[in-house]
């Protein structure tokens, strides 16, 4: 039984039923349908904190998915898991891959900026000011791109850019 068939709450059950109907009637090839099923199971596992299971499902979806736009969201979610596990280098790699597949993904740009900002703060704490400035600069560049794509989002980033003279 797939993970999505085990959902216990009403919203998850409703989503699962709708997703199954869409899969059944959507005129796509079998690999695209399988990829979506793995992606859906990955999202379900991720939402429950089952990151190993989520990653396994996302990797299966990634192997089956052919559409770059759809792949970008799989790659993005893999990046989210690595970031939440503190694996920032891996997270950055997957966020960049997501952007290669879909350069209109402001959430990936934002998350890259957040990681660079975090690393800059850590560098500042140990008085590595040159590294900190370089990382703050990188964060600013990615936040500017994210804000350009989604001007009403990332208000805190906009405020930081303004208050630090980077906007």
Swiss-Prot record:
Pfam families recorded: TPR_1
Subcellular location: Plastid, Chloroplast thylakoid membrane
SUPFAM superfamilies, sorted: TPR-like
Cited Gene3D superfamilies: Tetratricopeptide repeat domain
Stretches forming TPR repeats: 35-68, 72-105, 120-153
TM region positions: none
GO biological process: photosynthesis
UniProtKB keywords: Chloroplast, Membrane, Photosynthesis, Plastid, Repeat, Thylakoid, TPR repeat
Source organism superkingdom: Eukaryota
GO cellular component assignments: chloroplast thylakoid membrane
Topology in membrane: Peripheral membrane protein
InterPro entries the record matches: PSI_Ycf3_assembly, TPR-like_helical_dom_sf, TPR_rpt
Family (UniProt): Belongs to the Ycf3 family.
Purpose: Essential for the assembly of the photosystem I (PSI) complex. May act as a chaperone-like factor to guide the assembly of the PSI subunits.
The name this protein goes by in its record: Photosystem I assembly protein Ycf3
Organism of origin: Galdieria sulphuraria
Top-level taxonomy: Eukaryota, Rhodophyta, Bangiophyceae, Galdieriales, Galdieriaceae
């Amino acid at each position: 039984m797939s993970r999505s068939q085990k959902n216990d709450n009403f919203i998850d059950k409703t989503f699962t039923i709708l997703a199954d109907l869409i899969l059944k009637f959507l005129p796509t090839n079998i690999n695209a349908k399988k990829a979506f099923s793995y992606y859906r199971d990955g999202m379900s596992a991720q939402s429950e904190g089952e990151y190993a299971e989520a990653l396994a499902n996302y990797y299966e979806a990634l192997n089956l998915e052919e559409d770059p736009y759809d792949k970008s969201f799989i790659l993005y979610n893999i990046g989210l898991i690595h970031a939440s596990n503190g694996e920032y280098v891996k997270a950055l790699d997957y966020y960049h891959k997501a952007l290669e597949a879909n350069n209109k993904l402001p959430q990936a740009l934002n998350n890259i900026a957040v990681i660079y900002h975090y690393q800059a703060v850590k560098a500042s704490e140990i008085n590595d000011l040159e590294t900190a400035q370089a990382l703050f600069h990188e964060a600013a560049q990615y936040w500017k791109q994210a804000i350009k794509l989604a001007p009403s989002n990332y208000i805190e980033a906009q405020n930081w850019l303004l208050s630090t003279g980077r906007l």
